[in-house]
């Protein structure tokens, strides 16, 4: 995955961000998800999807699932265009999202499975992310 991920990131980050993150930003406009993000109950994951930290009600779970379904559809399209795996595209977007979209005070999940809250320092990205 590392080689393909670096190639995808190096060659197509701008296009992926336009196609993928624009969809993500629109999808995250729901009030339940926005509130949960601000409270640290929902956060970005290194795998390119939203995650729920701890227990959540059915309505929040449904909205997070709906967002992740839209993300997967965007990742699937990009993967087909580039001839790579969906997982590689999702991880590349995950790297960009952790870098550019996780605000101070927001929760995020790295590949080690530990939820963290972003402080003033940049997030230490997984080794497969191109810096």
Predicted segment positions?
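Bacterial N-terminal signal peptides that target proteins for export
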Residues: 2-13
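Core hydrophobic alpha-helical transmembrane segments of single-pass membrane proteins
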Residues: 13-19
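Sec/Tat signal peptide C-region and signal peptidase I cleavage site
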Residues: 21-29
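Amphipathic, charged alpha-helical segments and their helix-to-coil junctions
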Residues: 29-44, 48-55, 59-62, 90-131
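Surface-exposed patches in mature extracellular/periplasmic domains of secreted proteins
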Residues: 63, 75-93
């Amino acid at each position: 995955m590392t080689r393909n991920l670096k190639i995808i990131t190096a060659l197509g980050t701008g296009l992926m961000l336009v196609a993928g993150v624009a969809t993500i930003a629109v999808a995250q406009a729901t009030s339940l998800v926005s509130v949960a993000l601000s409270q640290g109950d929902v956060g970005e994951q290194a795998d390119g999807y939203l995650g729920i930290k701890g227990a959540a009600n059915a309505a929040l779970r449904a909205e997070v699932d709906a967002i992740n379904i839209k993300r997967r559809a965007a990742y699937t399209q990009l993967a087909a265009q580039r001839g790579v795996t969906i997982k590689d595209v999702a991880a590349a977007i995950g790297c960009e999202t952790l870098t550019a979209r996780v605000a101070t005070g927001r929760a995020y999940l790295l590949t080690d499975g530990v939820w963290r809250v972003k402080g003033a320092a940049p997030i230490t990205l997984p080794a497969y992310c191109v810096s």
